[in-house]
Regions:
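N-terminal binding-site loop/beta-alpha segment at the start of enzyme catalytic domains
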Residues: 1-72
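Active-site mouth loops of central-metabolism enzymes
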Residues: 19-31, 75-84, 135, 204-210
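Glycine/proline-rich, positively charged
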Residues: 24-25, 38, 80-167, 171, ...
Length: 270
């Protein structure tokens, strides 16, 4: 799989998200998550994104990566108000991951970001985290995010970007390209909606020449065809999905006419 730049890291174009999919505690479920992680290694996926707010997901990642931590870059998020509460939550993330170093620590949905940024900068200076990022679900947060980008206070942004949600194309993606800010894409499949909730079967015929076999691959390939995107992080609870998702990051870039087709076909069937 092609490696891309996410700040100072060389990451796989397709990563692994853990929202809901890794919020598990039962032994049988943890065994399945270990298989997912092992499949990631086979598929050359080297980046895992989690969050303190994802229930048991951080701890499940820590268990599933035991003994193979060096195969992955780990990212998580702080989501709470208050300096001391934030510090406690971050400390818990280190414990959940069972690690002394986190490659990327993000401020989840920009919650109390002005309070948490100095904490993350201190941790970065102490060598406990590698990079600082922010995430946001809504366009109203983009002006503040772009200010942080311009002032050099963050290394990465994580935003939704897919065939329907394209607001980032207007200003945020061009600025990220100009400044070299890493771009992580959440919700490339809109939590599976663009695959599971279509009114009919999309026509894959025009995409077969690229090697695309499923609509999920088409949607992921649509995202990573934008060279300003560093990585997209679909979540899954099914080990067999890893190879399917990873293929989208191993294909030749989708040409613009096929990107238009994927977008139009998705919108037609929603």
């Amino acid at each position: 799989m092609e490696k891309r730049e996410l700040g100072t890291l060389g990451v796989s174009g397709i990563g692994l998200g853990t929202l809901r999919a890794f919020d598990v505690t039962e032994e049988s479920d943890l065994v399945t998550r270990r298989q997912i992680i092992e499949n990631c290694i086979s598929a050359k996926i080297n980046f895992i994104d989690s969050a303190a707010a994802y229930g048991a997901a951080e701890k499940a990642v820590g268990i599933a990566t035991e003994g193979i931590r060096d195969k992955f870059y780990l990212a998580t998020k702080v989501r709470i108000e208050g300096k001391e509460a934030g510090e406690r939550q971050i400390l818990q993330s280190f414990e959940n991951f069972n690690t002394g170093y986190i490659d990327l620590l993000q401020i989840h949905n920009m919650i109390d970001y002005q309070t948490h940024l100095p904490t993350l900068e201190r941790l970065q200076d102490e060598g406990k985290i590698g990079m600082i990022g922010v995430t946001a679900m809504v366009v109203e947060a983009y002006p503040a995010i772009m200010d942080l980008m311009r002032f050099g206070r963050i290394d990465t942004v994580q935003i939704p970007y897919n065939v329907v949600q394209r607001e980032v194309e207007a200003e945020l993606l061009p600025l990220a390209e100009e400044l070299g800010t890493g771009v992580m894409v959440m919700e490339p499949l809109k939590k599976g909606r663009f695959v599971k909730e279509l009114k009919g079967e999309p026509d894959l015929t025009p995409l077969k020449e690229l090697g695309i076999q499923t609509w999920a691959q088409a949607l992921l390939a649509w995202v990573v065809a934008d060279s300003r995107v560093s990585i997209t992080i679909p979540a899954t609870s099914r080990p067999e999905r890893i190879a399917e998702n990873a293929l989208a990051g191993s294909l030749d870039p989708m040409p613009q006419e096929l990107r238009d087709y994927v977008r139009e076909e998705t919108v037609r069937l929603l």
